[in-house]
Amino acid sequence: MEQKLYLVHLGYYDPELSGGVYESHVNLFFIGTDFEDVRDKAKADLLVQKHKMHIDGIQLIEKVNGHKIIVDKKDGDETQIQNHNFRELSKK
């Protein structure tokens, strides 16, 4: 089956932030074949389990600004992400 890119919006209550009264959120990317597959992968994720996160929503990302997203499996299981903070971007 074809693998696709999904964004999973997760909520959790962190006792270190305001005593856990307010819900915090994080978005994580997963690769999967369908929504159920991605749901299961998200629930099995160690970070999700550690913080007792729950799934608020899942988005399938197929096209962005006219560009089709193609998932191409490479060797290894690592995730590679490049991050740039506001200060780095505002210098340009």
Model features per residue range: what roles?
Residues 1-25:
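Short aromatic-glycine-(Arg/Gly/Cys) micro-motifs in beta-strand/loop hairpins
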Residues 13-15, 33-35, 63:
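Generic structural motif
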Residues 18-57:
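Extended intrinsically disordered, low-complexity coil regions enriched in Ser, Thr, Gly, Ala
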Residues 48-92:
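Short, mixed-charge low-complexity intrinsically disordered segments
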